Structures are given as C-alpha cells and as structure tokens.
C-alpha cells in the first residue's frame, strides 16, 4: 500500500474512539475543496526542491500499530481513496488479526471491494463521503458518476 501519511493519535477521526490514522496516496476524484489535495495524484508529488514525498512501509506501520493496542481503540484508513490500494485487503486483515477496530473513509466508488470487506467482517465502521448530488459530481469532483 502507498501510505503517504500517518497520525499516531486522533480523537476526532473515529467517533467515540482513540485512533491512529493512515493516509493513502491517490484518489480517483479531483474535488476542488479537498483538504488532502497532495494525496490526489496516484503517485507522490514533488516539492519545490524536487523531493518526492516518502511512503511509509506498510509492515512497519502494522508493527507500530500492534504496539499501540493499549493506547488506541482502532485505526482509520483514509486518503486519498483507500480502495484504490492493491494491498488494502491484506493490510486490513493484519489490523483485524491484531485485534484493532478498523474504520474506512471512502468515496464509495469501489463497491465490489467495499462489499467484500464488509461481508468478511473486516470493517467496523465505514464513512462514505457523498460529495454532491449525482448531477453535480462532474462539476464538483471532476468525475461523472
């Protein structure tokens, strides 16, 4: 997985829980109001000096999260759009095997993967961002629905 950001402690991202937040790189929308615009490109962007944003190692993040089980109640996977990540299912499985609650923030554009994760009992909370009325998606999100 392309993990482009990590927050050790959040009291606001998972209602009623203390969580860590993992931010994935890449989104299939281009919402003009996005507060994580640097995560929209499928690859990390370069800063003014030409440096690429580093990705976090997924296994290292899982290891760190396992050590924080007594501090956090769960993990939020956000982005970008997490369901674009090829390694999402195995990442979530590792978190569940570690006894952590998992919240997924998604734009809902990958319903097949979302259904698989829900049906497998791998998600404890799903926050689906409905961005606009269906007839306004192209204008607001840069994508027809």
Give residue ranges: language-model regions:
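Hydrophobic packing within well-folded, soluble alpha/beta domains
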Residues: 27, 31-34, 95, 104
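Conserved AdoMet/S-adenosylmethionine-binding subsite of the radical SAM
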Residues: 62-74, 83-145
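Short, small-residue-rich loop/turn micro-motifs
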Residues: 26, 38, 130-134
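Conserved non-cysteine loop/helix-boundary elements of the Radical SAM core domain that shape
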Residues: 39-59, 80-86, 137-145
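N-terminal [4Fe-4S]-dependent radical SAM core
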Residues: 1-23, 30-50, 67-70
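Short N-terminal amphipathic alpha-helix/helix-capping patch enriched in small hydrophobics
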Residues: 20-23, 27, 57-61
